[in-house]
Amino acid sequence: MALVKEVLEVLNRLSPFELQESWDNSGLNVGSGNSEFSQIIACLEITLQIALNAQENALIITHHPLIFKPLKTLNDEAYPGNILKILIQKNISVISMHTNFDKTHLNKHFARALLRFDGLIEKGLMLVKENANIEFDVLLEKIKLSLGVGQLACVKSSQMIKDLAFVCGSGASMFSSLKAQSCLITGDVKYHDAMIAQSLGISLIDATHYYSERGFALIVAEILHSFNYLVTIENFKNPLQII
């Protein structure tokens, strides 16, 4: 069997962990680089069910770090201790590819492959399309069609949108670097973000955290397949539902 550190080295070459934000926790979160693994699983998030279904000695590659904030206690009756207990008992290793992967792969997938926009400029965690000159209503319908959803929360501050900005995941706080008549497409838009953006003449479209990043597992699987690794993709439904 192959070693965890061999996969870690491949991932680091393609999406260097040093690119992650200072507050992030990408890299080997659980296990040892010298461990052998029985299978590779790629997922957006490690859920309790994914941990239960995984083989012993598996390697799970996830987008969101299971261990994100420093742990003061490890309570197996609370999150994330309930999942960590299973992983440790089954000798499962976990690699997280978070903000480093946003910069190198996932944001491009969100804006280009999923939403089908081109001519994009990289600005930190954002991808920007200048002089898009598109009507807000047309833009909103295009995004809903691309995501396959009927409704999206949004802030319509102007009918004509000059510049577009894309941030997969939770990027609503980044609108402060934009100008009036811009539109930021991201996830996790909060009430106060919406109020401030509206006052500045900036539009927002909440494509949701889930939909903007759900391509993660497939991208990782395709990358590792090119290095002759077999990867099982574990998908799950968005836990937030509109009823």
Curated annotation (Swiss-Prot):
This is GTP cyclohydrolase 1 type 2. Pfam families: DUF34_NIF3 (PF01784). Signal peptide: none annotated. InterPro entries: DUF34/NIF3, DUF34/NIF3_sf. It is an enzyme of class 3 (hydrolase). Pathway: Cofactor biosynthesis; 7,8-dihydroneopterin triphosphate biosynthesis; 7,8-dihydroneopterin triphosphate from GTP: step 1/1. A divalent metal cation 1 binds at H63, D102, E213. Its EC number is 3.5.4.16. Converts GTP to dihydroneopterin triphosphate. It comes from the Bacteria.
